[in-house]
């Protein structure tokens, strides 16, 4: 619900920090576009620094999220992460086409992240969004040879990939560092 309130600009990025602190959470996961006109993606360097300062004052970790894996999206998310003092960037690929071609494009995106940002101090997490199965995600992580790359497990996304979530969890478990929790019903 916070995401939807952020889309309506009723909860803004700084508010999310307050909510996390008030609920004794360890940090926030925030998309570069959360808050619309007031999003991190629309903040200048001074505002991003102030957001990071507030998170540190509240002893909160920041995880930046973006909804693509292309260079421009990664560059934007990493720039925001570094300016706010975030610890990680979550991304997910959004490509269509032949699976072999899509996996190749994603592998190239990950290679770009490795070559450009492996020494940035950030960790990177790839999330499956409906298309890739667990073994394909694990292969992408292993083949990347990138120690700072891990997987985000989302129960419902595995259903959308036509894979039983518990089986997917078992396959992905050694590489999972983040989880999205939500209800889902297999019909």
Regions found by a protein language model. Give the residues of each.
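Active-site beta-loop-alpha junctions enriched in small/polar residues
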Residues: 1-5, 31-35, 65-69, 94-96, ...
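Acidic/histidine-rich catalytic cores of soluble enzymes
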Residues: 28, 112-187
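N-terminal pre-domain/capping segments
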Residues: 1-84
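Short, hinge-like loop/turn segments at secondary-structure boundaries
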Residues: 46-48, 81-83, 107-108, 142-145, ...
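Active-site-adjacent beta->alpha loops and helix N-cap segments on the catalytic face
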Residues: 39-49, 72-73, 97-109, 133-135
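CE4/NodB-like, metal-dependent polysaccharide N-deacetylase domain
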Residues: 79-86, 111-119
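Active-site gating/metal-coordination segments in enzymes
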Residues: 75-101, 105
């Amino acid at each position: 619900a916070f995401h939807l309130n952020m889309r309506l600009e009723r909860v803004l990025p700084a508010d999310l920090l307050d909510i996390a602190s008030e609920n004794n959470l360890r940090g926030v996961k925030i998309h570069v576009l959360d808050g619309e006109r007031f999003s991190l993606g629309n903040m200048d360097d001074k505002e991003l620094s102030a957001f990071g300062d507030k998170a540190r004052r509240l002893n909160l970790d920041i995880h930046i999220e973006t909804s693509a894996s292309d260079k421009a999206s990664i560059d934007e998310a990493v720039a925001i992460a570094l300016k706010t003092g975030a610890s990680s960037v979550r991304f997910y690929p959004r490509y269509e086409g032949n699976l072999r071609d899509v996996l190749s494009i994603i592998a190239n995106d990950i290679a770009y992240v490795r070559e450009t940002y492996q020494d940035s101090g950030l960790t990177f997490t790839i999330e499956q969004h409906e298309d890739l199965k667990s073994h394909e995600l694990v292969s992408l992580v292993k083949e990347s040879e990138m120690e700072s790359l891990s997987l985000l497990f989302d129960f419902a996304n595995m259903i959308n990939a036509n894979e039983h979530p518990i089986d997917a969890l078992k396959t992905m478990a050694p590489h999972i560092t983040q989880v999205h929790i939500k209800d889902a019903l297999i019909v």
